[in-house]
């Protein structure tokens, strides 16, 4: 889209918001790229009172709520832990490419687990972190939604 098209779209969004909530103060509008659908996974961290930060991996989106098919490790993790977390979920065949679906980039998912583990080590103030969903593709992965809670 051109700069003029973006400006016109911004004006429409602001006008619509003010129509629905006349007293609203609007400081800006978030614009982000729409990503193509991929295999949905979740990566999360919670703090256990006894063990400290615990990393979670599983199928994402609504599947995590329905299937509760997740793996956990205490932070920090190493490459072997990341590989095992991915391979031990029941949904692993989906990540390998099931019934004609493209396989997910397992190396990128392992790297993402390791990066989240390192991030949590470097930022002990993070109480919770959720990347859900992460779209896994044959050649990469991208977090589409994220939530971080700071203590």
Question: Could you tell me what each predicted segment is?
Answer:
Residues 1-151:
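ATP-dependent carboxylate/acyl-activation modules
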């Amino acid at each position: 889209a051109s700069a003029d098209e973006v400006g016109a779209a911004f004006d429409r969004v602001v006008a619509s918001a003010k129509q629905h909530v006349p007293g609203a103060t609007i400081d800006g509008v978030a614009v982000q790229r729409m990503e193509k659908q991929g295999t949905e996974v979740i990566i999360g961290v919670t703090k256990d009172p006894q063990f400290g930060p615990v990393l979670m991996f599983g199928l994402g989106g609504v599947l995590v709520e329905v299937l509760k098919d997740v793996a956990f490790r205490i932070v920090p993790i190493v490459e072997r832990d990341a590989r095992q977390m991915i391979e031990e979920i029941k949904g692993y065949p989906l990540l390998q490419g099931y019934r004609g679906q493209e396989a997910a980039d397992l190396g990128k998912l392992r790297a993402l687990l390791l990066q989240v583990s390192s991030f949590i080590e470097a930022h002990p103030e993070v109480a919770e972190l959720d990347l859900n969903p992460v779209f896994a593709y044959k050649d990469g992965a991208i977090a589409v939604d994220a939530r971080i809670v700071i203590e």
